[in-house]
Curated annotation (Swiss-Prot):
Localization annotation: Nucleus
Family designation: Belongs to the protein kinase superfamily. CMGC Ser/Thr protein kinase family. CDC2/CDKX subfamily.
Annotated source species: Emericella nidulans (strain FGSC A4 / ATCC 38163 / CBS 112.46 / NRRL 194 / M139)
Biological processes per GO annotation: intracellular phosphate ion homeostasis; positive regulation of transcription elongation by RNA polymerase II; transcription elongation by RNA polymerase II
Active site positions: 155
Gene symbol of the encoding locus: ptkA
Name this polypeptide is given: Serine/threonine-protein kinase bur1
Amino acid sequence: MGIASLERDTKGGTRFTGCTSIREFEFLGKLGEGTFGEVYKARAKRDGSIVALKKILMHNERDGFPITALREIKLLKMLSHTNIMQLREMAVERSKGEGRKKPSMYMVFPYMEHDLSGLLENPEVHFSEAQIKCYMIQLLEGLKYLHGNCILHRDMKAANLLISNQGILQIADFGLARPFDEAPPQPGKGAGEAKRDYTTLVVTRWYRPPELLLQLRRYTSAIDMWGVGCVFGEMFKGKPILAGNSDLNQAQLIFSLVGTPTEENMPGWSSLPGCEGVKHFGNRPGNLAEVFKDQGPMAISLLTELLKLDWRKRVNAIDALKHPYFSTPPLPARPGDLPSFEDSHELDRRRFRGQRAAMPPAPAGGSVGMSRNGGWSTNSGSRTGAETRNPRISSAARSQGNQLRDAWSNEPQQAWQRRGNEELKDPNHSFSSRHRDGGLPPKPPAPIQHSWASGHSDKTGRDRGYGARYGGPEGSVDSYVPNYGGSDRNRDRDQGTAISDRRGSYYDKSHQTSKLDYSREIPSRRRSRSPNYRERVDRGPYRR
């Protein structure tokens, strides 16, 4: 087989066409902006189609093209499914001016009128149960395809689910996605067991599963299924169901809703790194059935399966699609039968927020994020790229981390149970519009060393014990990067796990968080593998 055969696809068309010029698009308006890039609505001149152009910002040009963008581009070009966002092409803008030496890059997506988060913020939008079932089936079909091809999304949330006025839902934002090494999930067997360590610097806090909060490194596709459960409940309530303002508060809300961990409902929880020094979280059964009592027993049953504390027994996408919830009246609506709504992107949502009733205060906490002028807006002073790559942290930061560890072990049980339950005991309780106005809670910031239980850097005795308990080699942590050629060693580093929280399909916003909530992982040199991507869609659950 000659090289020439790679230049044409199976239909004889050109396989690699390079980047389109930005002059091929007519800009129609701005949809949103954030730390990852700016997003514009545009019209393709060659065929008149409406597209979204996501401009990739180069905050540190000397570091080269952002690794998160490289990951997203590679995976999206390999994936092909009705419920997965399609990357049509890349566009380049070359400036003739002397002040701009490097071109600007744009990712070109089909235009989608909404993201799920925006629809839920629109006070004029109310989902019927048939509509919720339709969206859930499409979400589960997309995840079934992803997990069946050994891909973890790792940022499942309402803002990353795009919806068109034709009723089609698509999973977007693959900046944190990566292949996993284990076998794909099998019917009736959950997500299986992970055989290696992955970074815990993933998933937006409000949708983060308990095993990640407790620093489990050997996680599986079950982390995405927890996010599906959070989205499912959010569609019923019209607001995030677990909106914690810190990792500690997030765990409190989870345990108030689904019960505190025990060796029966979450075996091995006390051995996880995040539980060092914690003997118990009290003994509460949870009140999920009470919070969602208006949704009926079948919806509660599916929610219970999706929000299981034990990640080994959490339902996978294959089995979730077979749940009786989807075959009981009202049956799922067809996508084409769903109503259409006015556009709901970032700039549109600002108007919706002004229409919402007064709500409780926004979550508190430190602030880490990019300000409008590109600088770090943080309570702890400036933050540079060099700092994010430094494997050491200051003694002051370690001291604060130890205080956070003490909060887990020393805070009176009654106090956190009472505070966590206040948000959940009232089904009609409203969340502050500023929860969204200030952006969703962030993806984890650039890695720093985790210091809850130790002031030592890199591998401690605790880390070695953890690796031995779970049977894995030390330092075998997630550092997936796209398999591009070249000898640039910087491309072998996992630098892009969480520098920003994307606020939707095409864009993201600055966020507020404490950089002590997260741990430092040790990068390795693992290369990617391209799975066999084939679309397999079962439309059986839809109403005929």
